Amino acid sequence: MVLDLDLFRVDKGGDPALIRETQEKRFKDPGLVDQLVKADSEWRRCRFRADNLNKLKNLCSKTIGEKMKKKEPVGDDESVPENVLSFDDLTADALANLKVSQIKKVRLLIDEAILKCDAERIKLEAERFENLREIGNLLHPSVPISNDEDVDNKVERIWGDCTVRKKYSHVDLVVMVDGFEGEKGAVVAGSRGYFLKGVLVFLEQALIQYALRTLGSRGYIPIYTPFFMRKEVMQEVAQLSQFDEELYKVIGKGSEKSDDNSYDEKYLIATSEQPIAALHRDEWLRPEDLPIKYAGLSTCFRQEVGSHGRDTRGIFRVHQFEKIEQFVYSSPHDNKSWEMFEEMITTAEEFYQSLGIPYHIVNIVSGSLNHAASKKLDLEAWFPGSGAFRELVSCSNCTDYQARRLRIRYGQTKKMMDKVEFVHMLNATMCATTRTICAILENYQTEKGITVPEKLKEFMPPGLQELIPFVKPAPIEQEPSKKQKKQHEGSKKKAAARDVTLENRLQNMEVTDA
């Protein structure tokens, strides 16, 4: 995921100042641009010198051949005149005055200079890339410039009644319909582990079927993706911070052969966007085949580092969930990708409108965008039981930022193009099932249970097509369990012990002062 290097090169029509300004608007380090420009300039000088040295090496070989053809004496003198050693003034005439043995020595010295130059070039290339991959995509002009998404995300439009309040939050409702095992899930899988069961399994499957049918009717190709990716491929679709904060690493045998003890490093996907982005890696996509639209279905795995204490109960923010994703490869020409961007968010809006979920669309501030996104719109549903808007959909246009590193090119072949172009790539959530279930539970709650949304009825089993009944009391209204009481008593004892310790310390201080 990188920008075009020519954007940093003034002699190629680039504008480093524009990229520096973009970094500032993203509230990221603009100094990365200057470091990249410096490394790139040195890299280009190094490559130019290496090219010249190779030409001189070829000239030496040619001159040796001519001298051998003329049967000139080889000689045994390996001394090299001072004017030749600089290589900068080395010409065919200068070589013609040397013995074959001397020219061979010059050629060896040139080889050493080439190796040194190549080592420097590789070092500069790595330095340049380290800066390049941490510089974000160019921003769309409509992106709000701010580093505070809680205050400055721009509400673009609202659909439905986003003021109504209801009694229970999704945290209680998943228990009331007996569709969730949280404590046992945590014992088995750790923090945020859960079992989805009973009626909520049917509701989840209904959402998956309805979302896939909706996208299929709009020309999307359903695709079920791998759940893990090779490290070298994941590096091309994920930014560096995701490896620390989001992705799970999987270590396994590198071969199916029993005597092979090598190990392979892979990563669980955080979204089907990642494997679908790599689906056409190293390919040329023909203009007449675009857009290519995929409806990705996968389980997603996220560490949620940095989310400690947020949404710890229920199924809204979990480490594992199912998701249907819109993913599109688009032409880079004629504003086609931005037209597709609007089409994709509209598709998501119509899906949630059909489910009767109130929402607003927000334009995400520049400081909260990931490196790849040129612009991102979120659909945040109204949760009447929680009294808050919660994110259900993110829709991003990454332009050619992802495609460049994945080498997904636009057109036929390089021979038919004046300059290599890259396709534009877009992604948008259609339905993250656990979050959408939470939204349905809060919006469709009644005194007796959850009314099934009209569009999902045909996908639900007999007996559950109209109402999902409450079968358990709301946890918020229950007496504390024995375990909870024990934990509460333990907390009280610890607090009392701290108070006694503090009092003793104060008394000791008084004695000392006296």
From Swiss-Prot:
Modified residues (Phosphoserine): 241
Keyword Aminoacyl-tRNA synthetase: yes
Known outcome of mutating residue 213 to L: In NEDMAS; reduced protein stability resulting in a significant decrease in cellular enzyme activity
Record EC number: 6.1.1.11
Pathway given in the UniProt record: Aminoacyl-tRNA biosynthesis; selenocysteinyl-tRNA(Sec) biosynthesis; L-seryl-tRNA(Sec) from L-serine and tRNA(Sec): step 1/1
Keywords, comma-separated and alphabetical: Acetylation, Aminoacyl-tRNA synthetase, ATP-binding, Cytoplasm, Disease variant, DNA-binding, Epilepsy, Intellectual disability, Ligase, Nucleotide-binding, Nucleus, Phosphoprotein, Protein biosynthesis, Transcription, Transcription regulation
Residue intervals passing through the bilayer: none
Recorded consequence of changing residue 54 to A: Strongly decreased enzyme activity
Compartments it resides in: Cytoplasm; Nucleus
NCBIfam families listed in its UniProt record: serS (TIGR00414)
PANTHER family, alphabetized: SERYL-TRNA SYNTHETASE
Protein name stated in the entry: Serine--tRNA ligase, cytoplasmic
Lineage summary: Eukaryota, Metazoa, Chordata, Craniata, Vertebrata
Underlying gene: SARS1
